[in-house]
């Protein structure tokens, strides 16, 4: 959602939507999450949000800070095609990881236990967040997703995710 003041909507705004047929037969939603499931993250956090914030504020954090915006369909499709019983998938956009996990936990009626040390945040993102007083776990990503699935399938799912460039940094975070 993009909200702009009246008369301030100069420039180009692009909106997209997808229409398709679900052929996998899985119920992929927070209501499918079960106690003991693994939480997989497709890569490092916060690059998109910090890139946008730094550009808007005219700040520079070195050469490497760039958006993580990327298409996720190949990575997700690889896991689904392999027959892994994915319980929930969510993109890590508005509100970052914490908002996404809170939504899943609340909808599922469960709590989520994370290993914070396993959550990847690049040093330049961590530094930018520190300078601006932000928590990198609450910063938006545009090319990252969470997959919640049975623990016995986590290694296979990680292998498939890591085989796709966009999710080469996939890891188990909880």
Spans of model-derived segments:
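Helix-biased detector of long, well-ordered alpha-helical tracts
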Residues: 1-174
């Amino acid at each position: 959602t993009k909200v702009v003041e009246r008369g301030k909507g100069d420039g180009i705004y692009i909106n997209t939507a997808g229409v398709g047929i679900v052929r996998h037969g899985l119920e992929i939603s927070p209501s499918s999450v079960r106690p003991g499931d693994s939480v997989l993250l497709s890569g490092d956090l916060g690059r998109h949000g910090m890139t946008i914030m730094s550009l808007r504020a005219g700040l520079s954090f070195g050469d490497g800070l760039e958006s993580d915006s990327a298409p996720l369909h190949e990575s997700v499709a690889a896991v689904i095609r392999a027959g892994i019983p994915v319980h929930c998938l969510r993109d890590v956009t508005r509100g970052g990881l914490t908002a996404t996990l809170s939504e899943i936990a609340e909808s599922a009626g469960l709590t989520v236990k994370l290993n914070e040390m396993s959550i990847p945040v690049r040093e330049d993102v961590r530094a930018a967040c520190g300078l601006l007083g932000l928590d990198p776990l609450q910063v938006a990503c545009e090319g990252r997703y969470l997959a919640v699935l049975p623990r016995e399938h986590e290694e296979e799912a990680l292998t498939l995710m890591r085989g796709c460039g966009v999710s080469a940094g996939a890891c188990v975070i909880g």
